[in-house]
């Protein structure tokens, strides 16, 4: 009950000023001969919001000021509160209100007669029209509030000069006489600038913003394909944009022929995680040969622009080919001081150049390019070895061996391998003979095996420089190249370099097809050429070509497996960028890596690399490191428990949250 009494007294106190105001107005109107003022309770039209008349200074009732203001009353039925316009002349004729005439307000006694007050405040039609004309009217054709419209700082818009408002259009206001020229110069192709004044259409499929002509702000040289789009085509292109795959996404092998057996998606073998062991071993051996250096030797430090010489010959006291009357030859690995690449330097010991024109033949051989050909780079004479020597520079093929060495070790060659070697050598001979040259080096000591099923013809151009002064017939040497190729096939088929001593007996060990090929190559028919022999071996070419394609697919598969092998390195680099480093803020530099998300990253670092077993010994499990970092890179929802080193803090967090913490910390550092 006491609460109700307090509430009634409080409400009476709040209403007392309003009742006093109404009583004073009633007393004022009863003594004034002028018509009553307009009141919002009885007016039939409402002044628009925002069109307010400046309010005169407030004066307290009972003062002797000549102007009295009629306070409007709040009407809940009106859409907005609008102050009424007071006729100053009507108030001046009556003078200020007499506060003594107002009856005293007694709460709870006499009720207020609202109908009587409403009748007294009834406005005449003429006075209402005058009051309405004194207010500014809202014109729909006039733009709204325009800041800075006048130089004086007034925020009132200039109604007379304001441009008319037109929906979905943009009006250009000319500030000077040159504005038209400026507007013309800014016109451009559609789609250059965005026009936000597009009306919303309910039920439309999608919102497509309009584009307005304007200059394209693009850096010079940038290929902006948006220039060809218009009317929302840019938004359509953005919706169809495809983003690149994440680094942790691996695509499975798409060739079913390469699978040894059918496995389920979750079943893996050891070969699925590692490089092919044979390819791995071969590549490592090549790297060792490239990086091998000579500890101590009597070789010169520099030979022309080449340095770091390493002897590659296995037999130092014998000539390489064993032919009588020829100068000894030595082969070195060297490095070019200009381009930093490895080359093979073939030295002809004791050679004296008698004709400078002999070096011109090197240019012809430099133009020969073939996958079964060891390119000749340059030739020069030198005395850096202590004598007159001819140096021939060829491409260096690491881990390459000659057929002569392989045959001496008892290497067996299958029929398919022999046919593959035959086709490769016929192809390179066809290229050489078409250039008007002869190889003169189709010999087991000059043919290199540089990979599975790959051979290369080496030392080409060597005898053109040595025997330059001799009158030689190129056609005869081309026929000799084909005959030597037949003898080479015979040696490979018999697995011995001694097979050429008794050709007739060695041919009996070959099958009919190979026997026919060798007999044709060894024949004295001068019309035979490398291209004709290749044409006759077209049926054999299919199998070799298919094998080369399968090898290419296998190498591409191995390359794809190693495509993103640097993901974990990048991830570990990010972790070390964040942990135990000062922060970007000088005030929080010491605590930056120990607070917030960075503390989780530090605990995760200990979880990956600093684990211990139950005996307190360090655990160095590479599988745990790789598995955990892969999960972090993928950002999966799996949760792990992170425990501080003192064991007082224990946090459960997912790999997804940890990945977000790392990205957030890196953004702070940037």
Curated annotation (Swiss-Prot):
ATP binds at residues 346, 445-446. Keywords: ATP-binding, Coiled coil, Cytoplasm, mRNA processing, Nucleotide-binding. The keyword Cytoplasm applies. Signal peptide: none annotated. InterPro entries: Kinase-like_dom_sf (IPR011009), PAN3 (IPR030844), Pan3_PK (IPR041332), Prot_kinase_dom (IPR000719). The keyword ATP-binding applies. It comes from the Eukaryota. Residues 578-670 are annotated as: Knob domain. Belongs to the protein kinase superfamily. PAN3 family. PANTHER family: DEADENYLATION COMPLEX SUBUNIT PAN3 (PTHR12272), PAN2-PAN3 DEADENYLATION COMPLEX SUBUNIT PAN3 (PTHR12272:SF11). This is PAN2-PAN3 deadenylation complex subunit PAN3. It comes from Yarrowia lipolytica (strain CLIB 122 / E 150) (Yeast). The gene is PAN3.
